[in-house]
Amino acid sequence: EPEKRIKQYPFELSGGMRQRVMIAMALACEPDILIADEPTTALDVTIQAQILELMQDLQKKLGMAVILVTHDLGVIADMCDNIIVMYGGRICERGTAREIFYNPKHEYTKGLLRSIPNVNNMKKKLVPIAGTPINMLNLPAGCAFCTRCDAAMKICLTEHPDELTINENHKAACWVNIRDRLMAEGGEGNV
């Protein structure tokens, strides 16, 4: 009923309908890239699935790329081919969805994955990420995650690590990986 909807105010629409309106506005000029920032926040599971299906259909129909910004790992697993994990405004890890979910290399990514409920083992205790989120106004010189990281070393506090290539589809910026690579190459692993 577009004739009816065009005359309505946002507060008169459901959350799902507001999301559809936002998607329609974003796609009106047929962009090459759609940036969807938390497109399913505050939507119930049924409407969430409809919105995600709509986005996938439009992506295929219009041949556009979609950059999906979300904290919902379930949505990421269903929707994404490639993933960039960020913490404190910096990229921690990037790779294919398969690499990130089955072979995480950054301690933050590992922590996120440990905190997902396992439907096959509901008795398994969830492991929260220790500490409190970083103050974005007071970032450390080193890795932003270091104060919450069980594997942190002294260098993590003072120097931000370069991205290390794990394989052609996977990179991570973590001193632990750099140390492990040095040790695997016959060094002492001093970083």
Residue ranges, per PLM feature:
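Residue-level micro-sites within transmembrane alpha helices that shape
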Residues: 17-19, 47
